[in-house]
Structure formats: structure tokens, C-alpha cells
Design a protein with these regions (language model features):
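Mature catalytic domains of secreted/periplasmic carbohydrate-active enzymes
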Residues: 1-142
């Protein structure tokens, strides 16, 4: 109960002290089951888009890593597919086992062809920097 109250206070602060907020991307443990959190967000920021990792279906889907689909299939709702440059971590990891350039480009192409957007994650190191091994891969893709 204390953690739920903490989340409510944080959401209230974020959605009232920083102007117009367009998107709320939940990424928290599902054991916090409180549909009122999405209601609070929508009350504080009318028109906000909320992902599907909260307590209702949200406004858009967020599949992670590998998304299997039939050739020619299209998403039936707004979708932002997520992946990371590396196979082992969503953040920075020294000696990361990176996905191949070909794999990432193919994933991006597939999601975009289905009508979705693609979030490619690259985490900073302990000094807050995106290291060259990560940055170089991003430059090569984009």
C-alpha cells in the first residue's frame, strides 16, 4: 500500500509540474494492480497516451524483443515495439553480446511495415555516456 501511494504521488508530481505530457510509458511490476493510476494520469493530463503495461489495455501496444507476425500482417492498434542493441541487457553492459546489424535493420523494417514504430534502446555507462561501441551501431543503422 505504501508503494502504491508513492507511485500516485510521483505521477501527480510529474503530470502537474512539467507542462503538457504527451505519453506515459509504464514499465513496473504487474503486482501493483491499481487501475486508478491510469485514471489519475488521464484526469491530470487529458489526451495523454498510455501504454499497455499499466492496468488496462492502454492506448498503444509495446511488444519487446522478438515480435512474430505473419507476412503482410498489420497492427490493429498503435504499436511501439521495443528492443535493445544488446541481447543481454536493456542498459549499458560492458562486453555486451550485440544483435547483428542485419537483425536490427530487419526488425525495424518489419515493425514499420506493419504500421508500428520502433524504440531501439542503448543505455549509458556509469558516467552517463553512450560509448562508441553503442553509438557506432546506432549511426550505422540510422
Amino acid at each position: 500500500e505504501g508503494y502504491r501511494e508513492y507511485i500516485k504521488n510521483q505521477i501527480t508530481e510529474l503530470l502537474t509540474n512539467y507542462g503538457k505530457i504527451y505519453t506515459l510509458f509504464w514499465d513496473i511490476p504487474p503486482k501493483i494492480d491499481d487501475p486508478l493510476l491510469n485514471e489519475l494520469a488521464r484526469r491530470l493530463q487529458p489526451g495523454i497516451l498510455i501504454n499497455d503495461r499499466g492496468w488496462d489495455k492502454g492506448d498503444f501496444s509495446t511488444p519487446e524483443r522478438e515480435y512474430r507476425a505473419t507476412e503482410g500482417e498489420r497492427f490493429t492498434r498503435m504499436t511501439e515495439a521495443c528492443n535493445s542493441l544488446g541481447r543481454q541487457s536493456w542498459g549499458y553492459r560492458e562486453n555486451e553480446d550485440f544483435y547483428s546489424y542485419r537483425h536490427l535493420v530487419s526488425s525495424i523494417d518489419r515493425i514499420m511495415a506493419m504500421g508500428g514504430s520502433y524504440l531501439l534502446n542503448a543505455g549509458p555507462n556509469a558516467e552517463g555516456e553512450i560509448t562508441e561501441d553503442y553509438a557506432g551501431r546506432i549511426r550505422r543503422i540510422f
